[in-house]
Amino acid sequence: MIRINQIKKSYGTHENRALILKGISTEIEDGDFVVILGASGSGKSTLLNVISGLEQPDSGSVTYDGTDITAFNDRELTAFRRENVGFIFQQYYLLPNLTVEKNVRMGADLAGNSDYRSVLKAVGLENKLKKYPGELSGGEQQRVAVARALAKRPRVLFLDEPTGALDEATGRQVLDYISRLQEEYRFTVVMVTHNLNIAEMANTVI
């Protein structure tokens, strides 16, 4: 279980500091599909970054089964993210000089997992292994990003507007892949979106 307790986060200089997260508390059960819903600038991505360990809060705690990651130093946070979480963002961040297979294998290698081909097959890319990112459509590139994140078998998958750069039909297809893979691999999903239709996929909305 992930417990978020009285998280506060602010940005800016001392004179012009803006409080973005104002004492947020919630719990996320293992295997939950959680959506952080809100308008642009409401602090959705900031909350995701704090929960995932990409940013530290000003105060409060984030615990994974009782372990408070806000007490970790940078080295410990890096190790925690490598071992426990996967990330998918609106931008794909694929390495253009590597094939689909090698991009995905990078995620598997981080976790010492050799079974990355099953994830490639699950997202319908088994026939694109030798293609390069520049040869793929936007939807296919995002599926590569999904496969790379899941190849390491993360405990929690964090997604920040993962379909924002895709048309509605392609975005829905990518989300369907994620939903099916979650059922198969039983990981927790925490996704940021402003889209009410996407939020309907979740069993918990923050």
Model-derived regions, located:
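ABC family nucleotide-binding domain
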Residues: 2-205
